[in-house]
Amino acid sequence: MATQTSNPQSVYDFTVKDAKGKDVDLSIYKGKVLIIVNVASQCGLTNSNYTDMTELYKKYKDQGLEILAFPCNQFGGQEPGNIEDIQQMVCTRFKAEYPIFDKVDVNGDNAAPLYRFLKSSKGGFFGDGIKWNFSKFLIDKEGHVVDRYSPTTSPASMEKDIKKLLGVA
């Protein structure tokens, strides 16, 4: 389960679990532009989102982009596998080099504290709840939520906003 400081001001105030169950203090990403996304392996949006995210990561990782992927099984049971299976699929099929974290809940009583913060910072069009797999949050270099993108918004269409935050022409 992810933890947080008592009054979080940015995503850097959170600690989450990596795929091996070890704590990761998100402050290690200070100075980076982040995409935080809830992912699923068996969703109709899986191929397009992972493909676009992998391309964006390859293109901008050296300029300071990081993608933090959090598997979630809350939408249609579309992420039923264990974390090892998920990592294997993502790294083999989509050649993902960005971190895949431990499975989380993004809604409800057991929602990860990080996701509670993200949702309270940028509510969606239909309220605060995450509606489906591949909801994306864009985070600036100071750890603040800049924007929220719907599951059907392709990561490639976020490129202009990412470049602006990275300061890349």
Curated annotation (Swiss-Prot):
The keyword Cytoplasm applies. Protects cells and enzymes from oxidative damage, by catalyzing the reduction of hydrogen peroxide, lipid peroxides and organic hydroperoxide, by glutathione. Its EC number is 1.11.1.12. Gene3D superfamilies: Glutaredoxin. It is found in: Cytoplasm. Keywords: Cytoplasm, Oxidoreductase, Peroxidase. It comes from the Eukaryota. Belongs to the glutathione peroxidase family. Monomer. Has a tendency to form higher mass oligomers. Interacts with FUNDC1; this interaction promotes GPX4 recruitment into mitochondria through TOM/TIM complex where it is degraded by mitophagy. This is Probable phospholipid hydroperoxide glutathione peroxidase. It is an enzyme of class 1 (oxidoreductase). The keyword Cytoplasm applies. One of its GO terms (cellular component) is cytosol. One of its GO terms (molecular function) is phospholipid-hydroperoxide glutathione peroxidase activity. It catalyses: a hydroperoxy polyunsaturated fatty acid + 2 glutathione = a hydroxy polyunsaturated fatty acid + glutathione disulfide + H2O. The active site is at C43.
